[in-house]
């Protein structure tokens, strides 16, 4: 691989490598390399997953522009954002303005809501899925310029929610932390993307492989390189028409092993795909997207790349056992390997 990289203050640099890893948020490198991929929900007929929709669509999960608030001990209420509508957030928690919640069985107290993401040093992470700052937009195929413009709306939506917390719920001493991100707007560099392109890999992991690993024709559990145990959790309530989608809130699954073949494109040599762009179904992405799994995917990708280069092998020729041994040598995650065996 040969890549041209514009290094800040150093001009254009050329990077050559035998193996490349796509760890982008939306699988942009995989697309540039010609890897096949899917976006949105497959149908029940495509994946044979019982909870998949009857027809495919291009709907992805809501994103969230997370904010970190800090208690300043004084009123730091921001000016009312343009277009602010408190009805958008009325049922983020139990309060007098909540009349018709979208999810009546998920209306928490405001104290539980604000402490959901409580951090040290009088700070609070605002990543609230229940009529909070989730925001629907499918920007996967947009240009960088289009994405930038679209994300301004997501940022604005989060600021509207911050104003709701301050003005409607009385948390007027909480404001954007000024010591977390070196950005002009005090927000993170990127939003939380819950869904990406999903490549066509050597294998495609789906819900059935997690629910009943030992009865499948493909014994994918034998090639496990990461484990997860979080329920299938999709965020869709900010999509207009979410009522017509499957109910994918905390669908229970057992602990599962993610197979190595999900990281390897089936038609492009020398490329490993990580993050949320691996070869999984839309449904099971609701659990493989979680950070503990994604961290393991990154470690597996690094181990796989190192072994391929060291042994002068193609990526799909590297032994999964050797990849696991590299994990074992790291010690901190060796217990995961035994769960996969």
Can you annotate each of these PLM segments?
Residues 6-341:
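Flavin (FAD/FMN)-binding glycine-rich loop and adjacent Rossmann-like elements that form
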Residues 1-3:
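Short, hydrophobic/aromatic-rich segments at coil-to-beta transitions
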């Amino acid at each position: 691989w040969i890549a041209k990289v514009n290094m800040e203050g150093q001009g254009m640099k050329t990077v050559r490598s035998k193996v490349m890893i796509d760890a982008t948020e939306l699988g942009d490198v995989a697309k540039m390399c010609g890897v096949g991929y899917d976006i949105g929900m497959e149908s029940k007929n495509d994946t044979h997953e019982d909870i998949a929709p009857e027809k495919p669509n291009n709907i992805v999960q809501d994103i969230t522009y997370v904010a970190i608030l800090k208690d300043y001990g004084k009123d730091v209420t921001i000016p009312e954002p343009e277009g602010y509508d408190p009805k958008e957030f009325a049922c983020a928690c139990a309060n007098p303005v909540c009349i018709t919640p979208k999810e009546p069985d998920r209306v928490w107290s405001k104290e539980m809501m604000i402490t959901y993401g409580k951090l040290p040093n009088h700070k609070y992470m605002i990543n609230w899925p229940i009529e909070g700052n989730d925001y629907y937009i499918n920007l996967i195929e947009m240009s960088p310029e289009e994405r930038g413009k679209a994300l301004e709306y997501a940022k604005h939506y989060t600021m509207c929610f911050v104003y709701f917390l301050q003005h409607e719920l009385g948390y007027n001493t909480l404001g954007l932390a000024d010591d977390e991100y070196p950005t002009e707007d005090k927000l993170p560099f990127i939003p939380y993307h819950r869904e990406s392109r999903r490549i066509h890999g050597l294998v495609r992991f789906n819900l059935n492989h997690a629910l009943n690993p030992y009865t499948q024709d493909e014994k994918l559990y034998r090639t496990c390189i990461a484990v997860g145990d979080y329920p299938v959790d999709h965020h869709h309530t900010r999509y207009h028409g979410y009522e017509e989608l499957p109910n994918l809130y905390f669908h229970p699954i057992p602990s599962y092993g993610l197979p190595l073949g999900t990281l390897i494109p089936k038609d492009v040599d020398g490329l490993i795909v990580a993050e949320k762009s691996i070869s999984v179904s839309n449904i099971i992405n609701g659990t493989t997207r979680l950070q503990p799994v994604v961290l393991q995917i990154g470690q597996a990708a690094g181990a796989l790349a190192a072994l391929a280069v060291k042994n002068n092998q193609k990526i799909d020729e590297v032994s999964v056992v050797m990849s696991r041994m590299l994990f074992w040598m790291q010690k901190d995650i060796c217990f995961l390997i035994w769960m996969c065996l």
